[in-house]
UniProtKB/Swiss-Prot annotation:
Protein name as it appears in the record: Iron-sulfur flavoprotein MJ0731
Family from the record: Belongs to the SsuE family. Isf subfamily.
Positions with a binding annotation for [4Fe-4S] cluster: 46, 49, 52, 59
Cofactor: FMN; [4Fe-4S] cluster
Cofactor binding comment, as recorded: Binds 1 FMN per subunit. Binds 1 [4Fe-4S] cluster.
Function: Redox-active protein probably involved in electron transport.
Subunit structure: Homodimer.
Keywords per UniProt: 4Fe-4S, Flavoprotein, FMN, Iron, Iron-sulfur, Metal-binding
Organism: Methanocaldococcus jannaschii (strain ATCC 43067 / DSM 2661 / JAL-1 / JCM 10045 / NBRC 100440)
Record-linked InterPro entries: Flavoprotein-like_sf, FMN_Rdtase-like_dom, ISF_SsuE-like
GO MF, one example: 4 iron, 4 sulfur cluster binding
Pfam families from the UniProt entry: FMN_red
Domain of life, per lineage: Archaea
Amino acid sequence: MKVFGISGSPRLQGTHFAVNYALNYLKEKGAEVRYFSVSRKKINFCLHCDYCIKKKEGCIHKDDMEEVYENLIWADGVIIGTPVYQGNVTGQLKTLMDRCRAILAKNPKVLRGRVGMAIAVGGDRNGGQEIALRTIHDFFIINEMIPVGGGSFGANLGATFWSKDRGKKGVEEDEEGLRVLRKTLNRFYEVLKEKRGL
């Protein structure tokens, strides 16, 4: 079972902690994990130049997205985390998602059937976490992936944290957020196992 975790935060704080917590939790269950953070990475905007459509050989930009493409193809499951910026995902994460067009142009079914899970960290209790989760779920659905939440009563769409604008410390101290993350991870793990016939 191979899981790729992506942190869509330009900082190595709350979202970085939450995604790594998730990967370590799954690693203890026997998963092989890989991690990518947009922090300090060069990821150019999609120009809609259609190079990827015409050439079918990836993106015209040769930057840190190459690592993302490789790991998305490698993974059985994908966990994407984001802090909430202006009520939604970060610009860096949106750019990463937009740039996935390049591998889909080469093979439209390349991500089909992979299991996807979302994590959102907000400085406010109701800062847009669920909107950010839905944006990530839209990415999963558009690319024929299987989005999972943690189920009713607390983790409907995925894992959310209230950091109180205290970065990693705020996430570490959000006991309800950690409970919801584990609940969502357990469902993610179950679906991955079912998909792999384990």
